[in-house]
Every structure is written in structure tokens, then in C-alpha cells.
Amino acid sequence: MEGARLIIEEINKEAEQKIKYILEEAEQKAEKIKQEAEKKARIKADWIIRKAQTQAELEKQRIIANAKLEVRRKKLVLQEELINEVIGAIKDRLLSIPEAEYMEILKDLIVTGIRELGEEKVVLSSNGETLSLLKAHLKEMEESVNEKLGKDITISLGEPIETIGGVIVQNLEKTIRIDNTFEARMERLQADLRTKIAKILFG
């Protein structure tokens, strides 16, 4: 009986050791699985955070880019509004200038045109009213132009053209022309205005 009891105790002892070993091994495996799971979770969490940060940065850059485009668009609209406002004011002023002042402006435009043309015999074209005004003061205009340029300039009047004012100065053959109509002058002014306003708005 004593021998049987000892054998049973030995069996129980071995069983307990095996159970202990199995439990320890199970705990180790469980800890390893837990650590790997935590590691994977951290990696995934880091990836999610990085992805979110990247997406947030991209969204921020997109918003900034769109805002810059919108600001530029508004500046361009403002630029055109300012140019149109200035040109409109000039047009209104030109359409209401007194005759004496208009004659002085015409003289300056004619002198400038003749200088650029480099001819002593020229033909002037403008609207009907301006041509009638020049016709009535042609001798006086020639004398003023000659005095200004120090040359003997001969001025002829051409056919009426569509313009709000100013003149086109041409050679006799009408192969070379200097467009000093108000529209042409304003077009040149418009380009200059656009440059100046753009410099103010866009730096």
C-alpha cells in the first residue's frame, strides 16, 4: 500500500509539474501574442497618425493654394475695375473739353505724330467734327506746328474716320501712319496702367 501511495504521489507530482510547465508556456505564448499584438497596434496606430497627418497637410496645402488663387483672381478683377474706372473718367473728360483746349491737345498730338513720322507733308484723319474744326483753323495750326518743330510742314486733311477724338498722322502715300486718336492713346495708357496697378497689387 505504501508503495502504491508513493507511486500515486509521484504521478501527481509529475502531473503538477507538467501542468505548471504547460501553464508557464501558455502564459509566455500569451504574453508574446499580447506583445506582438501591441506592437502591431502601435505600428498601425503610427501609420494611421502619419496618414492622418499627411492628409491634413495635403488638405492644408490645398486650402492655402485655393485661397491664393482666389486672392489673385480678386486682384485681377480689381485691376480691371480700376483700369476701366480710370479710362472711363478720361473718356468723359475728353468728350467734354472746351474747343480751345481741344485745339491745344490736337496740336500736341499732331506735333508728336509728325516727329515720329519724320515727314514734312502729312495727312490728318479724324472724326467729322474734328476735321471741320481743323479745316476752320488749318492755317493757324500749320503755323503753330511749324513754329514748334522748326520746319515747313504742309498739312492736308483726309477722310473722316470712326473715333471719339484725336488724329491719325500719315504720309502723303498713306503707307505710314501714327495713330494718335484718343482710343489709341488710351490703349497705350491702359497697358501702362495695367503694369502700374499690377505692381501695386501683386508686388
UniProtKB/Swiss-Prot annotation:
NCBIfam families: PRK03963.1. It comes from Thermococcus sibiricus (strain DSM 12597 / MM 739). GO terms for biological process: proton motive force-driven plasma membrane ATP synthesis. Pfam families: vATP-synt_E (PF01991). Component of the A-type ATP synthase that produces ATP from ADP in the presence of a proton gradient across the membrane. The lineage of its organism: Archaea, Methanobacteriati, Methanobacteriota, Thermococci, Thermococcales. Belongs to the V-ATPase E subunit family. This is A-type ATP synthase subunit E. Its main location: membrane. It is a peripheral membrane protein.
